[in-house]
């Protein structure tokens, strides 16, 4: 065996292994101290890129969780304000109910109106001043706001909160025969609607905030029938309906002064007519003096109110009687007879309704419109009916469609046709909370519907905000779950296996020590060659 000393091969091999163990030990020390398997791109190029992408995703998810939490905070601020607004509206509603009672004087109702006005101002203040991070949320400007709750561009939620100022909330309404008033006090301005009050076949479509539907009106439907058809579709459209029938009897005049008897058969919701025979005091050729007294007619009609659904009221001058059926049944006055007064030769009686149809004793239609004269002919003293004498009149009702949100109603009838509407109804008209009046019983009752629909709007917005809060809570849970699992996946890629690295470090340390010892041995071997020269 040759003894070569010049190259020092054993020492070179030992140094090479020492350097390898030194690098391995340094890597293990770096991984153990940092906790990461990948500290440089060279440690794992592909793994490093994947881990970096996952880190960006995790940070985006964590920020999305914060965004969702902030969205919940915003919704809580708005919902709390709406809760207070609902309480204010409830108080206004209490005042409206109180003011609708005739137990209070006009001055006392003025006090109620004063409180209502202050509450309305408070509602406006809440709508204007409710803000989150100086962003108003209830004044109508908070529309289509986007909240980023995901790691990607399109992962956002859109939220809009309606305008809850008092001039923007209330009841949206469309009335049939829209040119006429809503109650009997406005009947004098009612417009003609064709040749008959018998409703013709007609389709009209309601476009509500929940959806749209088409209502088929059949010939001879009463206002109550149509009301029922509309309300049956409430869940589809969000639009409800009420109906009422109003009739005014006035213009009782004669060319003589004295007492007479007015008789008729009355139909409302009853199918069997009720005969009314009332004494009437008349002023000669006058409809405006206090000498004309229809009190007995009012009392006789009201005696059957429970059966007919018709309530009669009398004006202060006692010369006009209003008949109202709040359920929308047609009001029919049949077999009308007016006994002569002394030697009177003329009598006159006028009936005013939203849609009145007049018949003579043979059943033939004589006249239709909003104001028809029952008697306007000359008579002799034999109580014989003249040719123009009317035997019966039918008055149909008015339908009011209402919703808390704006809606439209369209009909297949044109302007002037014999349909539900004098003209195309178009968009609903808003009666807002800001216009509430409690000064009269009628105003207070109307205010109830306004407040109720305004509360519906408040409830709708609260429901939207509650839904957003619930959704954000679920989003936070999901985002947290995704972030956690992604972090776990990243950990498996870039985190160091501490047990394995500790073992590797121990191994490297032992091998390093062994290499150092072997270098010493290799040096001695080379020194042994020198003994050959001694």
Task: Mark where each language-model region is.
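Primary detection of the long, small/polar-rich alpha-helical "axial" segments characteristic
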Residues: 1-534
């Amino acid at each position: 065996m040759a003894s070569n000393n010049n190259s020092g091969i054993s020492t070179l091999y030992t140094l090479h292994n020492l350097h390898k163990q030194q690098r391995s030990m340094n890597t293990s020390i770096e991984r153990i101290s940092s906790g990461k398997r990948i500290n440089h791109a060279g440690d794992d190029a592909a793994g490093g890129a994947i881990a970096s992408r996952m880190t960006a995703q995790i940070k985006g998810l964590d920020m999305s969780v914060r965004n969702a939490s902030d969205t919940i905070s915003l919704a809580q601020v708005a919902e709390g304000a709406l809760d207070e607004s609902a309480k204010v509206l409830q108080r206004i509603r209490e005042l409206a109910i109180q003011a609708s009672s005739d137990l209070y004087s006009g001055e006392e109702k003025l006090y109620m109106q004063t409180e209502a006005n202050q509450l309305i101002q408070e509602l406006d203040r809440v709508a204007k001043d409710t803000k989150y991070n100086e962003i108003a949320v209830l004044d109508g400007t908070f529309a289509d706001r986007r909240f980023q709750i995901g790691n990607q561009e399109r992962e956002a939620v859109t939220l809009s909160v309606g305008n809850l100022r008092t001039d923007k909330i209330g009841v949206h309404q469309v009335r049939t025969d829209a040119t006429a008033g809503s109650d009997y006090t406005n009947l004098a301005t009612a417009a003609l609607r064709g040749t008959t009050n018998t409703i013709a076949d007609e389709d009209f479509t309601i476009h509500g905030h929940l959806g749209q539907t088409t209502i088929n009106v059949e010939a001879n439907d009463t206002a109550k029938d149509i009301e029922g058809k509309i309300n049956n579709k409430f869940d589809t459209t969000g639009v409800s309906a009420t109906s009422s029938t109003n009739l005014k009897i006035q213009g009782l005049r004669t060319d003589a002064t004295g007492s007479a008897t007015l008789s008729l058969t009355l139909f409302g919701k009853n199918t069997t007519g009720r005969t009314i025979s009332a004494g009437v005091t008349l002023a000669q050729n006058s409809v405006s003096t206090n000498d004309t007294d229809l009190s007995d007619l009012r009392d006789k009609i009201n005696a059957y109110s429970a059966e007919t659904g018709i309530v009669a009221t009398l004006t202060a001058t006692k010369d006009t009687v209003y008949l109202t059926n709040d359920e929308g049944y047609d009001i029919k006055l049949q077999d009308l007879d007016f006994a002569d007064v002394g030697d009177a030769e003329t009598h006159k009686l006028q009936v005013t309704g939203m849609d009145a149809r007049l018949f003579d004793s043979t059943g033939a239609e004589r006249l239709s419109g909003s104001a028809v004269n029952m008697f306007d002919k000359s008579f002799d003293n034999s109580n014989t009916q003249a040719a123009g004498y009317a035997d019966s009149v039918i008055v149909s009702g008015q339908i009011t469609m209402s919703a808390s949100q704006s809606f439209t109603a369209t009909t297949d009838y044109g302007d002037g046709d014999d349909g539900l509407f004098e003209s195309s109804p178009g968009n609903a008209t808003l009666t807002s909370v800001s216009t509430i009046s409690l000064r009269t019983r009628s105003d207070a009752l109307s205010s109830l519907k306004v407040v109720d629909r305004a509360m519906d709007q408040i409830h709708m917005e609260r429901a939207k905000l509650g839904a957003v809060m619930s959704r954000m809570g679920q989003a936070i849970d999901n985002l947290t779950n995704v972030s956690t699992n992604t972090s776990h996946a990243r950990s498996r890629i870039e985190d160091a296996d501490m047990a394995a690295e500790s073992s590797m470090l121990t191994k490297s340390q032992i091998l390093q020590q062994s290499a150092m010892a072997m270098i010493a041995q290799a040096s001695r071997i080379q020194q042994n060659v020198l003994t050959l020269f001694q």
